[in-house]
Curated annotation (Swiss-Prot):
UniProt similarity note: Belongs to the DsbD family.
Species of origin: Halalkalibacterium halodurans (strain ATCC BAA-125 / DSM 18197 / FERM 7344 / JCM 9153 / C-125) (Bacillus halodurans)
Source domain of life: Bacteria
UniProt key word Transmembrane helix: yes
Designated name of the protein: Cytochrome c-type biogenesis protein CcdA
Major localization listed first in the record, in broad terms: membrane
Disulfide bond positions: none
Biological process according to GO: cytochrome complex assembly; sporulation resulting in formation of a cellular spore
Any one GO cellular component localisation term in the record: plasma membrane
Entry's transmembrane regions: 6-26, 55-75, 85-105, 134-154, 167-187, 208-228
Keywords: Cell membrane, Cytochrome c-type biogenesis, Membrane, Sporulation, Transmembrane, Transmembrane helix
Function per UniProt: Required for cytochrome c synthesis and stage V of sporulation. Might transfer reducing equivalents across the cytoplasmic membrane, promoting efficient disulfide bond isomerization of proteins localized on the outer surface of the membrane or in the spore coat.
Subcellular location as annotated: Cell membrane
Keyword Acetylation: no
Amino acid sequence: MVEVTIWLAFFAGVVSFLSPCVFPLVPVYLAQLTGTQISGNEITADRKLILMRSLGFILGFTSIFIFLGASSTFIGQLFWGNRQLFEQIGGIIITVFGLQMMGVISIRMLLSEKRLQAKPRQSASFANSVLIGFLFATGWTPCIGLVLGAILVLAGDANTMWSGMSMLFVYSMGLAIPFFLVALLWSRSLHKVRKLNKWLPTIQKGSGVVMVALGVLLFTGQFSTIAAYLARINPFGI
């Protein structure tokens, strides 16, 4: 029975990738992997950096789901009790990142990596990706609520808190695999992507617009509303 439950949690994570407010964010995810490494209208991120950022993004949203698995603990209650605040903070940060990509604002802290070093500090890139994954997950939870809710019920029936957290970890790994595969394919296609260098300013601004829109929706709480609506009309039933 335990093995069946674990496999259900894993499959639910994979299926959640197809939900209507996770899958459409893949382009933004790709922009996050390389977006800040555009110098002189050329992509300068290497394969190792892209994969590291992908792992950071995965670690960020995995942390959220593990906290949910520990909902009976202080950390879980703190997150649930202040989820709206987390969404608003996340909305502000994502909006700032988007404005930076659009060229509307120029924040020295975000530009210092490119200006001071030939290659960005990998630790800083990893930390930024963890933060973005953490913030996006706060907005995802309403959309994947049906699937996640079922997993939380199973986790609540677990014998121990650690069993519940383990189940949410397996769910996160199911969701993480498609994201990592996308990053792997993206990193292996860099030589082709670089042929689009002349279009990078437009692509970068377009990605920035999407991030600003997501940030505003998160801050106003409309992301959750739209996500809940899309979840109802989703043909996959997830």
